[in-house]
Design a protein with these regions (language model features):
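Conserved catalytic motifs of ABC-family nucleotide-binding domains
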Residues: 151
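Conserved ABC ATPase signature
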Residues: 130-134
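Catalytic Walker B motif of ABC-type/P-loop ATPase nucleotide-binding domains
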Residues: 155-158
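Helix N-cap at the start of a conserved alpha-helix in ABC-type nucleotide-binding domains
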Residues: 166-168
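Conserved ABC transporter NBD signature motif
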Residues: 59-70, 75
Length: 168
């Protein structure tokens, strides 16, 4: 079986509001797919259901053929995501943030991974700064490093370029 994400007849309602209505798509390994649409059309809700953070009203999400609702723990260790709605701990340094997330994912070569990501994302001069003192764009680069720390097989991005400069 190839690695894939399959969204099947996925819907989500909040009381009387239909946030996502019966969507279907498949993303195969090494594909990059964007969900496009106006504000409030259900993109973030769809990502939440794909991660197993929100329960669909109907339909399902399969990750490599496994239902996310029934296999959250095993599947979430292979996934990661970025969202501008999730705050970084403000009193931790950039390095401490990356160490915490690396340990959560049992990254074996953690210091090497931190060094690599800090260079790639231009964070090396910020590693000892507390995240509460960073600009929005710098925080987004830390969030990206955090999301890549475990080399996820699935990376879901919700508004990943918000506040980033063109070089990033």
């Amino acid at each position: 079986m190839t690695n894939s994400i399959e969204v099947i007849n996925l819907s989500k309602s909040y009381k009387s509001k239909q946030a996502v209505n019966n969507i279907n798509f498949k993303i195969n390994e090494n594909e990059i797919v964007g969900l496009l649409g106006p504000n409030g059309c259900g993109k973030t809700t769809t990502i939440g259901m794909m991660l197993g953070l929100l329960k669909p009203t109907s339909g399902k999400v399969l990750i490599n053929g496994k239902d996310i609702e029934k296999n959250k723990i095993s599947l979430l260790h292979k996934m990661n995501f970025i969202s501008p709605y999730i705050e970084l701990p403000k009193k931790l340094t950039v390095r401490q943030n990356l160490v915490v997330y690396g340990k959560l994912y049992n990254v074996s070569n953690l210091q090497k991974q931190i060094d690599y990501l800090s260079i790639k994302l231009r964070l090396e001069k910020l590693l000892d700064n507390v995240t509460g003192e960073l600009s929005s764009g710098q925080k987004n680069r830390v969030s990206l490093a955090k999301a890549l720390i475990n080399n996820p097989t699935v990376l879901l991005l919700d508004e990943p370029t918000a506040s980033l400069d063109p070089e990033t």
